[in-house]
């Protein structure tokens, strides 16, 4: 069944991995855009606090990504009900699997990953740094998927998987086809712990952003090359120009007191 709760969870899990590439250019760029357009000097003169500014920038980006994911979700739901679809591969429409997929995949992944990308691009003012992080976290997730194939590593991989795929696999790896077609996703135990771990990391990152961010800060830069030292030599020694001042005749006679 292609629209079973199990199939939909896998579909939205893959969607979360693809949408993450939008984060640097939507969520991360919200503060960077102010510096790039040199509008920050004007914006920072307004009477808002640092917290208000960061929350507005972060959640405005989250809202835009939410709209994109919401429209994709509507497209998926409508696609299963278009004329010509094979009824043998479909079950009756049920809103709960969509809601579960949003709660366990889309929202947590968006918040914690968005917070990290937001912080990286904000402090480096470099969108490329955000994309590098996206690639790194996808590599990490791929490593954990491979690591979790061994039975003794399943629990560790389930807890550390940033997208929650291995946490779902922890409970559903040995499901039969009938169970995959009929049962809802088990939101319990290890799955909840995984989501809480990464939401906590995202929250901690945002708190760090708030603590470190300053309206007058300079961008953080990273370089593995040692910069050549430059010697500055003062070259204007003896360059003082002599000026002939007009001569003044001083008079201390008594008649000056009557002028």
Residue locations for each model-derived region?
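Hydrophobic alpha-helical transmembrane segments
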Residues: 1-34, 58, 62, 74, ...
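Secretory targeting signals
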Residues: 1-25, 55-127
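Terminal transmembrane helical anchor/hairpin motif
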Residues: 2-5, 85-93, 128-212, 216-220
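Helix-loop-helix units of permease transmembrane domains in multi-pass membrane transporters
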Residues: 29-64
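Cytoplasmic membrane-interface regions of multi-pass membrane proteins
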Residues: 36-39, 117-120, 218
């Amino acid at each position: 069944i292609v629209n079973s709760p199990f199939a939909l969870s896998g579909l939205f899990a893959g969607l979360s991995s693809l949408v993450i590439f939008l984060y640097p250019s939507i969520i991360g760029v919200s503060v960077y855009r102010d510096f790039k357009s040199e509008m920050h000097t004007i914006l920072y003169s307004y009477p808002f606090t640092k917290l208000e500014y960061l929350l507005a920038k972060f959640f405005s980006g989250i809202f835009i990504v939410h709209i994109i994911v919401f429209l994709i979700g509507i497209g998926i739901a409508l696609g299963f009900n278009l004329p010509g679809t094979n009824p043998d591969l479909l079950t009756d429409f049920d809103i709960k699997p969509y809601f579960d997929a949003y709660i366990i995949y889309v929202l947590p992944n968006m918040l914690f990953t968005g917070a990290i990308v937001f912080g990286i691009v904000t402090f480096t003012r470099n969108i490329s740094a955000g994309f590098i992080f996206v690639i790194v976290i996808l590599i990490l997730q791929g490593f954990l998927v491979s690591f979790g194939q061994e039975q003794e590593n399943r629990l560790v991989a389930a807890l550390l998987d940033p997208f929650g795929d291995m946490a779902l696999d922890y409970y559903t790896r040995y499901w039969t086809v009938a169970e995959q077609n009929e049962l809802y996703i088990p939101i319990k135990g290890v799955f909840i712990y995984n989501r809480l771990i990464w939401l906590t990391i995202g929250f901690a990152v945002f708190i760090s952003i708030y603590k470190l961010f300053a309206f007058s800060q300079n961008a953080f830069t990273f370089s593995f090359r040692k910069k050549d030292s430059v010697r500055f030599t003062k070259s204007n020694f003896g360059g003082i120009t002599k000026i002939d001042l007009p001569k003044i005749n001083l008079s201390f006679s008594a008649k000056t007191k009557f002028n």
